């Protein structure tokens, strides 16, 4: 798979990217400070251009960015976001209802709330599963 990762100042991207790559996936990374999580015309244009250049299977982020969701919807590309914050205020945006979105939330209350509001592709994913996997496999974090 070809995966585009939007990387911002979050602690867990090194492990996520390494995991995707260890599974045989091609990972490209885009980094840019956003004016707003909801709207940023300059970033949206840049992302649109990148998505036109290569056939990506999905865009991945830690936490949710409505601006990315909007571009993915326009381009017909899946947007996968994994939330490790609670409450994730950026999810209280109309774009959460777009069909391109695939949410993985660690907070069960938030999961139930958004599922109840009609968000289509949403799952509850415990953060401790990653820690448990490392303990079982004897792996240490790479960063």
Language model features: what each stretch is:
Residues 26, 78, 120:
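Residue-level detector of anion-binding/catalytic polar loops
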Residues 68-82, 88-89:
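Well-ordered mid-protein domain cores that form the structural environment of catalytic cofactors
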Residues 81-143:
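Catalytic core of nucleotide-activated saccharide and alditol-phosphate transferases
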Residues 42-56, 79-83, 98-106:
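Short, structured secondary-structure boundary patches
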Residues 1-75:
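N-terminal pre-catalytic "stem/leader" segment of glycosyltransferase-like enzymes
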